[in-house]
Amino acid sequence: MNVLVINCGSSSLKYQLINSDSEEVLAKGLCERIGIDGRLVYQKEGMDKEITEAPMPTHKEAIQMVLDALHNPKSGAVKDLSEIDAVGHRVVHGGEKFAKSVVLTEEVLAKVEECNELAPLHNPANLIGIRACQDLMPNVPMVGVFDTAFHQTMPRKAFLYGLPYEYYEKYKVRRYGFHGTSHSFVSKACAEYLKLDLKNSKIIVAHLGNGASVSAVLNGECVDTSMGLTPLEGLVMGTRSGDIDPAIMEFIAKKENLDIDGVMNVLNKKSGVEGLSGVSSDFRDLEAAYNEGNPRAIDACEVFAYRVAKYIGAYVAAMNGVDAIAFTAGIGENTSFIREKIVSYLGYLGIKLDKKTNDVRGVEEIISTPDSKVTVCVIPTNEELAICLSLIHI
């Protein structure tokens, strides 16, 4: 089965065409500057990238260009669009309504729209992409895969906030978690790689990218995760603050004469390691500044690693033990000095880091020593493949 995977943002769109049987990526690319001037990047497997500058007033024109590229006689991945069997859409927030991938009927889309206020930056864009695909491919099944779905197994003690219960009843204010597709994929891949029985395992997944989160996966199900109602809670991230004393919002608002939107902009876009360091949200830049002795870059890296280690420790307690810790995503897969810093706090678990294997980038590898009491590994994530494979079981 050929599955077109779509990840739609407000002015951009990423796509991959994947064969679910072979798990081969047939073609991939992105559309940028939708609504401005438009740019399509297309790459068939084994060929060079093709870049086309063309107007994309809306997502519909962008997706039409993707479809045209996919069955282009010269470099297309399919001879005819009828060879695309299904479209898998990433949807950021499914609230409490969706615990698994679902076919996108009108009834389902209405429920997704109800979740827009929980993810105002993401869900509306996801819906625009879905509608555009429906218009252009009316006979192809559309499936929604939700970032929040994997975390719906969290118990009430993990997802309820210490707020008046009426806010949960009226507005569904609770912890939802994100990166669920990645956490699900990596926990399964980790168990398979280490030959663990997923249904009898305790795995902690550290998805460390510009957005970052940790999850506790007990017997294949998520029992806790670091993000909350929104992706702002939890770890210190690229530009997001993560956990803070809520009273800071009032304090900063008064000092800086900001309204609530202004404060939220600071917490979401001007904080994290970029705000701490004054250098960058990119750990390649941070590592260079760290090695040059930049004190603020050193602070940023130390704070980031310390927060991750604290969450890992918390989830060891939540599961009463741990069999494996898996690092994934951009930083988790590629930044060895951050992994080393995080693991340095975990000696009490009997973890010993193998500094040689810890130098790996972007490949499956055990980075703990053979006599380490807990196995630590790097497991590359593949959210597009995970979305593709989730369609098979519907």
What are the functions of these language-model segments?
Residues 3, 12-56, 228:
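Short glycine-rich, Thr/Ser-proximal phosphate-binding strand/loop in the N-terminal lobe
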Residues 9, 89-92, 208, 326-334:
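Glycine-rich beta-strand-to-loop/alpha-helix junction loops that act as flexible
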Residues 69-84, 190-197, 312-323:
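Phosphate/pyrophosphate-binding loops at sites that engage ATP/ADP/AMP, CoA/4′-phosphopantetheine
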Residues 70, 74-122, 143, 149-158:
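Short beta-strand-loop/turn "lid" adjacent to the catalytic site in phosphate-handling enzymes
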Residues 150-253:
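Glycine-rich phosphate-binding loop of actin/hexokinase-like ATP-binding domains
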Residues 265, 272-276, 283-318:
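Adenine-nucleotide phosphate-binding core of ATP-dependent small-molecule kinases
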Residues 323-346:
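Glycine-rich phosphate-binding loops at beta-strand->alpha-helix junctions
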Residues 392-394:
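Conserved small/polar residues in nucleotide/adenosyl-binding loops
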